[in-house]
Amino acid sequence: VYDYDTLKQRLREMAFLTKGLKIRLVDERSGMEQEEEFHYEGGIKEFVTYLNRSKEALYPDVIYCEGEKNGVYVEVAMQHNDSYSDSTYSFVNNITTPEGGTHLAGFRNALTKTFNEYAKSNKILKENETALSGDDIREGLTAIISVKISEPQFEGQTKQKLGNSEARGAVDSVVSEQLTYFLEQNPVVAKSICEKSLLAQRAREAARKARDLTRRKTALEGMSLPGKLADCSDKD
């Protein structure tokens, strides 16, 4: 039995991942007749906009990187929003990779490196200040990473993780180069992302200090307990 909604989701995903592709879904079952068409000229840029539809975007335009390195075709689209979660989805030859892999690792490395370099060179982050972590930069990020490889190698028990080493270098190279250019050309957007990342860093550090304080307090209370018991026994 075919589930219409499951097919609809997968076909919409395929249309997003292949810009310009037109897919029609027709249900001719009696009493359940319906028809939909999926066609996105903007490809994965429109995919990010679709995923961010119920959120408030931090900046209007989706950041887009595209290129080919060492036989690997790379496409990346991303946009920050007002949420606190990281919604990054990766694909290889239009197949989802829920466990990530080398393409995701390359993207994350490029993102962290590029934003830290920009923040330091533009005095948003002072030399003696702690570098932004990947988690800080990815807070509120929606991103699509799509690579095309002639011979993909999958790892893990469920084979849902990309293992090709060349994918990491390709994604890292394409994103580093094009994201650096984008940030230099769009300083207002760059500053807004860096400031959001700094807020995430401060919140994370404040939460860590609060946890440490609670743990120390609990430890001290635990240490004082035997003394109280000893006092009671002396009075008896």
Question: Could you describe each region identified by the protein language model?
Answer:
Residues V1-D236:
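GHKL-family ATPase ATP-binding module
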